[in-house]
């Protein structure tokens, strides 16, 4: 599944408006959920979707460092403008939803994200 398809199917709001087509059509390789950046750095893998409630600028840095396909901010968590600026500069898709992380992750799993 491609990032854009995931955003469309789950009706997620794209926050990074200046990302490339390559970023939007990157393959989703799996998923990871955590609000601790250190856990994401140690356990998330390139190509994964990261579900978090964090919206500060270090989220974009970690996503870029790992090579994540996108960051999904759940639970109507606030996302700082600095975060979006860094994400756009690093071609990282950031999207948001007011749905709780648990429900979002369940829907992603039902779509096949993370299934081997």
Where do the protein language model's features map onto the residues?
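N-terminal, charge-rich interaction modules
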Residues: 1-21, 25
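Feature captures the catalytic cores and cofactor-binding loops of soluble hydro-lyases/lyases
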Residues: 23-24, 28, 32-49, 53-116
């Amino acid at each position: 599944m491609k990032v854009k398809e995931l955003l469309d199917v789950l009706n997620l709001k794209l926050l990074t408006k200046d990302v490339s087509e390559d970023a939007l059509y990157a393959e989703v390789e799996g998923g990871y959920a955590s609000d601790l950046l250190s856990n994401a750095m140690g356990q998330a893998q390139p190509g994964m979707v990261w579900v978090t409630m964090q919206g500060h600028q270090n989220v974009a840095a970690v996503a870029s460092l790992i090579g994540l396909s996108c960051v999904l901010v759940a639970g109507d968590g606030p996302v700082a403008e600095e975060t979006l600026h860094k994400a756009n500069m690093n071609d990282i898709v950031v999207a948001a939803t007011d749905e709780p992380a648990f429900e979002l992750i369940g829907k992603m799993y039902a779509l096949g994200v993370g299934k081997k």
